[in-house]
Amino acid sequence: MTRIYIATDDELLIASGNNGLWTVGTRLAGLSPRCLAVDPLRPERVYCGTAGHKLWHSADAGASWGAAGAGIAHADVTAVAVSPRERAGAFGVLYAGTEPSALFRSEDGGAWRELQGMRALPSAPTWSYPPRPHTNHVRWITPDVADAARLSVCIEAGALVRSLNGGATWLDRGPDGPLDTHTLLMHPRVPGQLYAAAGDGFDAPGRGYNESRDGGETWERPDEGLEHHYLWSVAADPGDAATIVVSAARSPEAAHAPRNAASAVYRRAGHAPWQQVRDGLPPMEGTTVAVLAANPSEPGVFYAASNRGIYRSADAGITWGRLGAEWPARYQDQRVEALVVTD
């Protein structure tokens, strides 16, 4: 069975599919879900960060939920991740990021401690989120797939910072790293291979897509073929690290405001230029920027979710089709905040 978790503006949607038949349910109504994570070794454990209601967790694949953020100092949990390498008993080590920017670690899913060194970095006074310039937040957390001590954290906006020792000390943003990273992934089979979809390209075309082969030490920006430079989401084929899809728009408003939305999905294979993919996807106009995902157990398969519904590609992103899962009409006026797909 495939399970798809989607955080919308108002609630969490869970679609469960088997042999092409889908059932849909909703949870956490009114809690404003913002981010999601699934324990890779225990996929029935799901975590959801919210705006104003801290962190929630489920131990039964989303059927029931309980509060899990009592030790997190801030109400807005904007990023959550589970380490694929480090475990404490039955739990994967859990990280949660907040607004204002702070990073917390838990080894049991409930007791938290802040990794305070991140907030003391020299670049911290310059961090600022443009819609609310007085503050900023942790946008993404990426534990290393091979080294449990390595961790990358993206601040919106202002920095991509790293720790090589589990958060005890931190390396500040590098001179050539992205500053406004929206999604940061490490390929599950290629340690050190990072993909970053960033907003940097809005002001500096050519800097929206970033990739690193050495865990963030250095960066490359292959952008030939990209005509939309404000990048939001990225997913990599679990079976082929060189096949990638990204979602993009010309501006933040075109990405996120349903009434003015105009977004695109691009695909890149190997060293070929990016190509916009349209077959089976909704029209650009009126479609908010998609959140993309891949299921580690499905090589060659990608998923996309936007205000127009849930879409799947079974040919590595070339063609797409809308899933039969029910998509409430009210979602057309909302944005998708997060997407996770698992078995």
What do the PLM-derived regions correspond to, one by one?
Residues 1-343:
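Extracellular glycan-interacting surfaces
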